[in-house]
């Protein structure tokens, strides 16, 4: 799983995206995070 550094965007206002997702995308500075593939038990949505 990819881990972001710095600030992480929340998913649905709940958990940090990269903490609850199998994969995420970051910008070049690692200051933004977006779910690509949520875990089955995660409340993140891609």
From Swiss-Prot:
Disulfide bonds: 4-18, 11-24, 17-35, 21-44, 26-33
Keywords, comma-separated and alphabetical: Disulfide bond, Knottin, Neurotoxin, Secreted, Toxin
GO annotation, cellular component aspect: extracellular region
Tissue: Expressed by the venom gland.
Recorded superkingdom: Eukaryota
This protein's domain notes: The presence of a 'disulfide through disulfide knot' structurally defines this protein as a knottin.
Family: Belongs to the neurotoxin 02 (plectoxin) family. 02 (plectoxin) subfamily.
Name listed for the protein in its UniProt record: U1-plectoxin-Pt1f
């Amino acid at each position: 799983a990819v881990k972001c550094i710095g600030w992480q965007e929340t998913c649905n206002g709940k958990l940090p995206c990269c903490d609850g997702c199998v994969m995420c995308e970051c910008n070049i500075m690692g200051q933004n995070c977006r779910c690509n593939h949520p875990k089955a038990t995660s409340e993140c949505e891609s």
